[in-house]
Swiss-Prot record:
Superkingdom to which the source organism belongs: Viruses
Compartments where found: Virion membrane; Host cell membrane; Host endosome membrane; Host Golgi apparatus membrane
Residues spanning the signal sequence: 1-22
Full protein name: Envelope glycoprotein B
Family from the record: Belongs to the herpesviridae glycoprotein B family.
Gene that encodes it: gB
Species in which this protein is naturally found: Human herpesvirus 6A (strain Uganda-1102)
Region of interest: Hydrophobic membrane proximal region: 634-686, 644-685
Site residues by UniProt (Cleavage): 399-400
Membrane topology according to the record: Single-pass type I membrane protein
Complex formation: Homotrimer; disulfide-linked. Binds to heparan sulfate proteoglycans. Interacts with gH/gL heterodimer.
GO cellular component, one term: host cell plasma membrane
Intervals, Virion surface compartment: 23-688
Disulfide bond entries: 41-482, 58-438, 131-197, 290-337, 510-548
Ranges of the Intravirion topological domain: 710-830
Length: 830
């Protein structure tokens, strides 16, 4: 019978005994983990044989980097835009419609039209700082419309003067500060025409590949500023609108008008686009643009050579630049522009820093770094080393310590010392780590080899990081994979005492490992006995016994719990974290590197970044606002709203048809005029002068009323004296009416036109002047006759000619000449 058959028979018998004599209350469920599950590790016949290799050699680390000295110059890509001046020419027409009413003028439609200035007029601007006051517009049908400034029908020249509002990048010149406005006839519509020439000195920007350029005014030209008509540069604008002139003389700055300094432009372009004429100087692209720009010069540098690249190290910049080993040749004209500059820098640096102690080790080399920087490297070699290699005795005799102590050598030594110290520190640390690691691994392998003789499965499992079954076969190890059991079926028994076939526990014999029962995966649910080993390994059989030691306490680990057995009986289980860990791990301690203050490397400054943008939004908005404030703001507007009641009447009359609409218009205009008059009177009264005048007039009116009132009271008190003031005069004054010496009482006619009443005539000497009145009463007829006589007397006084009438009746000088020799005849005599 084979060994495996005997083993399985023993397991079957043990299972039968456990099923008969074991109580389920006498076992607990054992815990497990994923790293070390419950498993059975046995050695099969076909196993893998392995051994420990202890023949290991540890060699020290050595660096193979090659270092060389020198200095280098770094160029960066020029991201700044090509900036150049541009002039724009524009004529602005303003048509202002207005309606004049009584005391007010209403502004109606206002039309502003921009027209491009013709090239011949731009020549007048560039030579005399003037433009024409007329403009002609030709429509597609051939019709020509003309407009004149201030509607004077004259084509004069207008002088340009600077606008008050200007920005840093733009200067504008105009001819009309405020639009012209003429007051039309009363109650009629009229239109005023104003012309303004606008010339702007702006700044344009173009970015590589220069397919367009933008002005600081916000305008764009779709074409290269270097296009001359035949060089093949990109130009998308209509060529018929482009005019190119050579050897052009123009005023450089219009600020001084026609007295400004002139300059000769080799080639200038005029482009008419929309409502603006543009002009700019055409230059050669290779002469005006350089695609590279000097960034920095590292006067003390090192170059480390690796397998495929060079490392250019700078202590000044605290940076290293990596570049392929292949050098470059600058052939593009936009890049060869830096050749004269960097050759000059190389000579200056060498003469100022290295002329006494170093020599140039060959010519300069050009590299392109991984950051697209152009690096010009100039290698150096110490003169002492160079002369030593050449074997020159003369040079050896001229060696002087003073040359070594020069300032430039000290700077280089400091840099070299810093680099060497850093390199040696890192290389020594890495070398020591590598050698120590190698020696530690060698010793560890030796220890594992010796420990594998005691517990081969534990050693091999730790090496592989998973449970492995191992057995020592002579000088080699036989390993195999463990068989995992059903993890949920494993149960740990509480008692460690041996039970005989009759189910009686022994008092002297105990198991040295706890008993477990389990079942296999994907098999019959029969229970198999075993014993708990290390790291959840299940040992088949129950033959591992010992004599019971009383008292005793044993702790066995299973999964995440520690099971405590006191006197071979389970008492409690505790988490494995409650047991303190014996820390046998040795940590590696390395001193940190010394401090290194790194500089912030700004490849492009903020000014360069701002100049890299073609569109400068800030300047465009500033230009727009200043231009709007200067040209398109009317200082004052006179606007009077039509009264609401007039609109109501007009709406009512519109419902009456055409007649009502016309009548409503007349009423609206009339009401508006009356409203304007009333408003003017109210405004006059609100004025201090008008208010004072009205106060004086009120005082005069009050005085007049008082005088009239007093006179009226006097009339009421003495009516005869007030009505007939001449009645109080002496009687002799009456004779002056007739011109005789007697009192002649005129005849008084009846009211009905009857005969007159006779009045006696008396001589002057016989007149009754006593003034006495008879006491006899008068009849009504006598009173009536007296009133008629008084009336007749009053009329005679009123018919008396006044002095002004007599003066007016006096003949004039012409009449006297004309009627000389004649004598005027009295009317009464006639």
């Amino acid at each position: 019978m084979s060994k495996m058959a005997v083993l399985f028979l023993a397991v079957f018998l043990m299972n039968s005994v456990l099923m008969i004599y074991c109580d389920p209350d006498h076992y607990i469920r054992a815990g497990y983990n994923h790293k070390y599950p419950f498993r059975i590790c046995s050695i099969a016949k076909g196993t893998d044989l392995m051994r420990f290799d202890r023949d290991i050699s540890c060699s020290p680390y050595k660096s193979n980097a090659k270092m060389s000295e020198g200095f280098f110059i770094i160029y960066k890509t020029n991201i700044e835009t090509y900036t150049f001046p541009v002039r724009t020419y524009k004529k602005e027409l303003t048509f202002q419609s207005s309606y004049r009413d009584v005391g007010v003028v209403y502004f109606l439609d206002r039309t502003v039209m921009g027209l491009a200035m013709p090239v011949y007029e731009a020549n007048l601007v560039n030579s005399h700082a003037q433009c024409y006051s007329a403009v002609a517009m030709k429509r597609p049908d051939g019709t020509v419309f003309s407009a004149f400034h201030e509607d004077n029908n004259k084509n004069n020249t207008l002088n340009l003067f600077p606008l008050n509002f200007k920005s840093i990048t733009n200067k504008r010149f105009i001819t009309t500060k405020e639009p012209y406005f003429a007051r039309g006839p009363l109650w009629l519509y009229s239109t005023s025409t104003s012309l303004n020439c606008i010339v702007t000195e702006a700044t344009a920007k173009a970015k590589y590949p220069f397919s367009y350029f933008a002005l600081t005014t916000g305008e764009i030209v779709e074409g290269s500023p270097f296009f001359n008509g035949s060089n093949g540069k990109h130009f998308a604008e209509p060529l018929e609108k482009l005019t190119i002139l050579e050897n052009y003389t123009m005023i450089e700055d219009l600020m001084n008008g026609m007295n400004g300094a002139t300059t000769l432009v080799r080639k200038i372009a005029f482009l008419e686009k929309a409502d603006t004429l543009f002009s700019w100087e055409i230059k050669e692209e290779n002469e005006s643009v350089c695609m590279l720009k000097h960034w920095t010069t590292v006067t003390h540098g090192l170059r480390a050579e690796t397998n495929e690249t060079y490392h250019f190290i700078s202590k000044e910049l605290t940076a290293a630049f990596v570049a392929p080993k292949e050098s470059l040749n600058l052939t593009d004209p936009k890049q060869t522009c830096i050749k004269n500059e960097f050759e000059k820098i190389i000579n200056e640096v060498y003469m100022s820093d290295y002329n006494d102690t170093y020599s140039m080790n060959g010519s300069y080399q050009i590299f392109k770094t991984t950051g697209d920087l152009i690096l010009i490297w100039q290698p150096l070699v110490q003169k002492s080393l160079m002369f030593l290699e050449q074997g020159s005795e003369k040079i050896r005799r001229r060696r002087d310590v003073g040359d070594v102590k020069s300032r430039h050598d000290i700077l280089y030594v400091q840099l070299q010392y810093l680099y060497d110290t850093l390199k040696d520190y890192i290389n020594d640390a890495l070398g020591n780590l590598a050698e120590s690691w190698c020696l530690d691994q060698k010793r560890t392998i030796t220890m594992l080899h010796e420990l594998s003789k005691i517990s081969p499965s534990s050693i091999v499992s730790e090496v592989y990081g998973r449970p492995i079954s191992a057995q020592l076969h002579g000088d080699v190890l036989a390993i195999s994979k463990c068989i995992e059991v059903n993890q949920s079926s494993v149960q740990l028994h509480k008692s460690m005492r041996v039970v005989d076939a009759k189910g009686v526990r022994s008092e002297t014999m105990c198991y040295n490992r706890p008993l477990v029962t389990f079942s296999f995966v994907n098999s019959t649910p029969e229970v198999v006995p075993g014993q708990l080993g290390l790291d959840n390994e299940i040992l088949l059989g129950d033959h591992r016994t010992e004599e019971c030691e009383i008292p005793s306490t044993k702790i066995f680990l299973s999964g995440n719990h520690a099971h405590v057995y006191t006197d071979y009986t389970h008492t409690n289980s505790t988490p494995i974290e409650d047991i303190e860990v014996l820390d046998a791990f040795i940590r590696l301690k390395i001193d940190p590197l010394e401090n290194a203050d790194f500089k912030v490397l700004d490849l492009y400054s903020p000014d360069e970044l701002s100049r890299a943008n073609v569109f400068d939004l800030e300047n465009i908005l500033r230009e727009y606002n200043s231009y709007k404030s200067a040209l398109y703001t009317i200082e004052a507007k006179i606007a009077t709203n039509t009264p609401s009641y007039v609109n109501g009447i007009n709406s009512f009359l519109q419902g009456l048809g055409a007649i009502g609409t016309g009548l409503g218009s007349v009423i609206s205009v009339t009401a508006g005029a009356l409203g304007d008059i009333v408003g003017g009177v109210v405004s006059f009264l609100k004025n201090p002068f008008g208010g004072g005048l009205m106060l004086i007039l009120a005082i005069v009116v009050v005085v007049i009323i008082i005088v009239v009132f007093v006179r009226q009271r006097h009339v009421l008190s003495k009516p005869i004296d007030m009505m007939f003031p001449y009645a109080t005069n002496p009687v002799t004054t009456v004779s002056s009416v007739t011109g005789t010496t007697v009192v002649k009482t005129p005849s008084v006619k009846d009211v009905d036109g009857g005969t007159s009443v006779a009045v006696s005539e008396k001589e002057e000497g016989m007149a009754d002047v006593s003034g006495q009145v008879s006491d006899d009463e008068y009849s009504q007829e006598d009173a009536l006759k007296m009133l008629k006589a008084i009336k007749s007397l009053d009329e005679s006084y009123r018919r008396k000619p006044s002095s002004s009438e007599s003066h007016a009746s006096k003949p004039s000088l012409i009449d006297r000449i004309r009627y000389r020799g004649y004598k005027s005849v009295n009317v009464e005599e006639a």
